[in-house]
Amino acid sequence: MVMHSEDEPYKCKFCGKAFDNLHLYLTHERTHTGEKPYECNKCGKAFSCSSSIRKHARIHTGEKPYICKQCGKAFRYSSSIRNHENTHTGEKPCECKQCGKAFSYSSYFRIHERIHTGEQVYKCKECGKTFTYPSAFHKHKSTHTSQKLYECKECGKAFDCFSSFHSHEGVHTGEKPYECRTWKSLQ
């Protein structure tokens, strides 16, 4: 049953948080129920809100609509370009209160905080193993399936890990985002 009031007509039956927008209310309640009604038709990953699946689809299409005005690098998400812009300014707005380490990216900061809390937010549904870092969790999930989720449009090679797929893309584009300082100094 949805509770209504004049100012905040939608109140969460699980935690009491109130909303004045039905869409935000329904999306919030899914954080409690775990309901994920929006499923990707490419890889089967499910989402609790429609905007998340639209953003996710860019992984499969390769679309990167956000372009950095300083260096031309393209990004899938608006949050990624905002964080990237800090690399040009050197700004590191996210500082850990526990150890003082600072980060350009808020997502890196949130992951770093888990070092101090020991929090393991990723749990494998297959075996129950828990993980602190999303990269380790996603890599682990591939041990339970032989399905390859990321396929190269150029050559057809498939990968179960996005980071491996992304690195492979450089074979076709010639992009080499990581340079060896030692090798460069020898040239």
Curated annotation (Swiss-Prot):
<keyword id="KW-0863">Zinc-finger</keyword>
<dbReference type="GO" id="GO:0003700">
    <property type="term" value="F:DNA-binding transcription factor activity"/>
</dbReference>
<protein>
    <recommendedName>
        <fullName>Putative zinc finger protein 833</fullName>
    </recommendedName>
</protein>
<keyword id="KW-0862">Zinc</keyword>
<keyword id="KW-0479">Metal-binding</keyword>
<feature type="zinc finger region" description="C2H2-type 1">
    <location>
        <begin position="10"/>
        <end position="32"/>
    </location>
</feature>
<dbReference type="Pfam" id="PF00096">
    <property type="entry name" value="zf-C2H2"/>
</dbReference>
<dbReference type="GO" id="GO:0005634">
    <property type="term" value="C:nucleus"/>
</dbReference>
<feature type="zinc finger region" description="C2H2-type 4">
    <location>
        <begin position="94"/>
        <end position="116"/>
    </location>
</feature>
<dbReference type="GO" id="GO:0010468">
    <property type="term" value="P:regulation of gene expression"/>
</dbReference>
<keyword id="KW-0677">Repeat</keyword>
<dbReference type="GO" id="GO:0008270">
    <property type="term" value="F:zinc ion binding"/>
</dbReference>
<feature type="zinc finger region" description="C2H2-type 6">
    <location>
        <begin position="150"/>
        <end position="172"/>
    </location>
</feature>
<feature type="zinc finger region" description="C2H2-type 5">
    <location>
        <begin position="122"/>
        <end position="144"/>
    </location>
</feature>
<dbReference type="InterPro" id="IPR036236">
    <property type="entry name" value="Znf_C2H2_sf"/>
</dbReference>
<dbReference type="InterPro" id="IPR013087">
    <property type="entry name" value="Znf_C2H2_type"/>
</dbReference>
<feature type="zinc finger region" description="C2H2-type 2">
    <location>
        <begin position="38"/>
        <end position="60"/>
    </location>
</feature>
<feature type="zinc finger region" description="C2H2-type 3">
    <location>
        <begin position="66"/>
        <end position="88"/>
    </location>
</feature>
